[in-house]
A protein has these predicted regions:
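Bacterial N-terminal signal peptides that target proteins for export
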Residues: 1-7
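Alpha-helical protein-protein interaction elements
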Residues: 7-9, 297
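Bacterial N-terminal signal peptides
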Residues: 9-15
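C-terminal segment of classical bacterial N-terminal signal peptides
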Residues: 15-22
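Gram-negative and organellar
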Residues: 24-429
Length: 429
């Protein structure tokens, strides 16, 4: 056990060659925000790439309860090492030219508990994309391949959390994604079109028998939006958008689910230190095979603000609807709220705080069926960093972090809890 701990602890030393580019309002939301239910702009966006090669390594120590969703009957201590390697190139998003990206992200797990071992101890992510920018037109193409093993996975690479963590605790899956987007600047407005195709291969692990059951999920989505700059609102873009598509699980006899989601959208880019973007609309879902139909309001708000004291605040609020990956007959309406704060102190010390809350309402799509369950997922993360003065590096930092994650369900079967400790070294050229 000590040998495994020592080997994986070596991953805690790493470096990151990157700049500290600020997102603006136009980059906070895009067509990917609406065609991808698991989209994270900090990982998927090509818009803020510059010439750089990056490498980052993090080691986490996890204490998990309810590994197998058996009402906290199984607990385990886990070491998790993450690595991200990539090459990115291209100019500024406002300049004509070509941006490109190729990234590998890996998660590696080792159990320190004799009663628990991983059948699939690693996650692998291969992300690639190009963006071609002309004087008035942008064309982007992204292709991703992701593979996750089951049982107690760690957080995503970009630090986000969602209900998919809870749902995938005993699910292993592969995901192939292809995304195409075109953006055209008109005289006083911008037209944006995005198309995505997702193919999932799930491996559901039966809790009591231990055998695996395979099933697929296919999703096609398109998003069309139009933004204009009103003369009466400075630094603001207002727009209309509509997302449409179809999701299908061939093993589900209820058939494919169609969706149509129109929305009002807005972007406010006050300064490099302040930007917000949001939307409000509704999500209409139906099936051709029966009389199922439901309408749910959806909304979102993303933004950041830097106070005069240099305190950096960020917020992310989202409500969305999507089919459950665990309960095949259910749709999940989730309300997510995330707020973060960063404060720099003297002597290069910084403190980062983040709180995340998600309420998930599982509703059966079968006629006459009652609500399946509701869940409250909460996460609190704190990180303490210290800037280091090292020659040849523009910026360098060592930090430690702690994250507490807990899920409370109306069915105790789905309750779980996690404590996560980590160490990270970061260097920038």
């Amino acid at each position: 056990m000590f040998r495994r701990f020592s080997i994986l602890s070596l991953f805690s030393i790493g470096f990151l060659w990157t700049g500290h580019d600020k997102l603006d309002a136009n980059e906070l939301i895009s067509s990917s925000t609406f065609t991808n239910t698991n989209q994270k702009s900090s990982l998927d966006s090509l818009s803020f790439l510059q010439e750089r090669i990056s490498a980052q390594f993090i080691t986490r120590y996890l204490q998990n309860s309810n590994i197998f969703l058996r009402e906290n009957e199984t607990e385990a201590d886990i070491i998790n090492a993450s690595v991200q390697l990539g090459i990115k190139g291209g100019g500024l998003p406002t300049d004509p030219g070509l941006s490109y990206r190729a990234l590998y992200g890996g998660n590696y797990f080792s159990s320190l508990t004799d009663e628990f071992e991983y059948d699939s101890p690693a996650d692998h992510n291969f992300l690639s994309g190009v963006e071609l920018r002309g004087a008035f037109t942008k064309i982007r193409l992204n292709a991703n391949l992701e593979e996750y093993g089951g049982y107690a996975r760690s957080e995503p690479f970009d630090g986000g959390v969602s209900s998919s963590i809870g749902e995938s605790r005993n699910l292993g899956y592969k995901r192939k994604r292809l995304e195409i987007g075109v953006s055209r600047e008109l005289s006083t407005s911008v037209l944006d079109l995005g198309l995505s195709i997702d193919d999932y291969d799930y491996q559901f692990i039966e809790i009591f028998s231990g055998s695996s059951v395979d099933y697929d999920r296919e999703r096609v989505a398109a998003d069309l939006s139009w933004f204009f700059e009103p003369t009466f609102l400075a630094k603001t873009r207002l727009g209309l958008g509509v997302t449409t598509g179809q999701e299908e699980v061939p093993q589900n006899f209820l058939g494919a689910q169609n969706f149509l989601a129109p929305s009002l959208r807005a972007k406010w880019n006050f300064s490099p230190k302040t930007a917000f973007a949001g939307w409000f609309g509704f999500d209409e879902r139906w099936r051709d095979s029966d009389d199922f139909s439901e309408t749910t309001s959806v909304y979102g708000l993303k933004g950041f603000w830097t106070a005069p004291t240099d305190t950096q605040l960020s917020v992310d609020i989202t409500k969305q609807v999507y089919p459950s990956i665990f309960e095949l007959d259910d749709n999940v309406a989730t309300k997510k709220f995330s707020i973060g704060a960063r404060q720099d102190f003297n002597r290069g010390i910084s403190l980062d705080l983040r709180f995340f809350y998600e309420f998930s309402d599982y509703q059966s799509t079968k006629s006459g069926s009652l609500r399946s369950r509701t869940e409250d997922l909460k996460s609190f993360r704190v990180s303490l960093g210290k800037e280091m003065n090292i020659n040849y590096f523009e910026d360098s930092q060592v930090s430690i972090f702690y994250n507490h994650l807990t899920n409370d369900s109306t069915k105790d079967y789905y309750d779980f809890e996690r404590d996560q400790f980590g160490l990270q070294f970061r260097f920038s050229l």
